[in-house]
């Protein structure tokens, strides 16, 4: 199928295109120089054209997501999705799989990264990926509390750890190294936690600092497309900004060396809003977002996503088990907890971010401060879906960023006065333009994930994942901005029109992306002996039953990396 998108106002930061009126040609799922006279015309006059959106951190599939669905029937009743010719769906903060795919597609998103996959339960994640239409997917396995990783890093054996990581990524069809509360979730298995970068992990004699730096070195030795993806210790605690800065600093000097992609950073700090808290308790709680932003701006190795609080009732879920228990003790709502053998653990707790709550108002302001004070090449839009709010609120966040008037309407009329008193968001006059919105929703993601060869831009050879929005580039009405980005005029996925006038008109199933790194054969064989012994002694499954087989995807996209020099 051939298309020509005519007269659109194009925003494509990876190619330096900032609001130019131009035509985009599509053929056989790719963007091309030209098409035949038989090409179908999409009239984008007066509309904005961007690459398909990319969500670099979201919880959309797998065990804890399904727990969130099961134990929150009240959430499933909040929003029912019934469209002629499509699958129905339910759920507001934890939507069902089909609804997840449809709603991302409505907003112009075409690629989503599942942010935390327990390796032992990876098959569950991939099963749900197969039932999530409209988007390409990838999942990040959890490594920061894995017994094998802790032991190799304690011994200082970076090469063996790298071989283990390479084996696990291929075995569970994973994309990147995810680290959550390094050492703390393992400690939670004993009813404990770690509270600083230098607290030893019980029974392993290794510290979070050594885990984070060690895995950063492993990542760059392997040359993975994405950097380490880090949820630091002490999430959600007053005063944690110091831990956040120390964690960022602990990988200084670890140079980005991707063998695939154009990534320049070696450290990705996710949901940074939850890690930018000042004060010593909730009584003197305050923002330290500007201090975090200042460090990020001057540090080549760091990039952040925000995790913007949207002031909704939502469902929190994370592999930071002790944090979820603390949350449960704070709000008294129901709590689910799970330990995943030698690998990780997690928790799920409902949460209500009331705009009239003083702490929640400051959390809201902290996220906006990060957006408004961080270099737009180094910040990415997320809500840590569903933890700070559902992904369907991205359009509202975009409206807050583009319109100071809309932002101030919330600041002065809807949220608690602490947002004014304990942050600097009221002082921020900055308003994002559409070029910057394109950066923080697609271009930056493509680059830091190592996918920018074919994703996140509209150059010739790129995948024809395209979003068209009915919005004037000069628009400052927050509600109009929000509506335009919530329901795209057109969306193309793989060169096919899948959304028209905000409605899904065609169901497609994207690829599941994973990394296959080949290291030296002798080194891998030695590591597999260790792996086999661990499975025999400790795991509840046999090693032969552990890997995810090829049947668990609609279609795989494999990023192959030759790292056989590691031996």
Curated annotation (Swiss-Prot):
Family annotation (SUPFAM superfamilies): Composite domain of metallo-dependent hydrolases (SSF51338), Metallo-dependent hydrolases (SSF51556)
One Pfam family per UniProt: Amidohydro_3
Gene Ontology MF, one: hydrolase activity, acting on carbon-nitrogen (but not peptide) bonds
InterPro entries: Amidohydro_3, Formylmethanofuran_DH_asu, Metal-dep_hydrolase_composite, Metal_Hydrolase, Metallo-dep_Hydrolases_sf, Metallo-hydrolase_FwdA/FmdA
Recorded family membership: Belongs to the metallo-dependent hydrolases superfamily. FwdA/FmdA family.
Name of the protein in question: Protein FwdA
Record gene name: fwdA
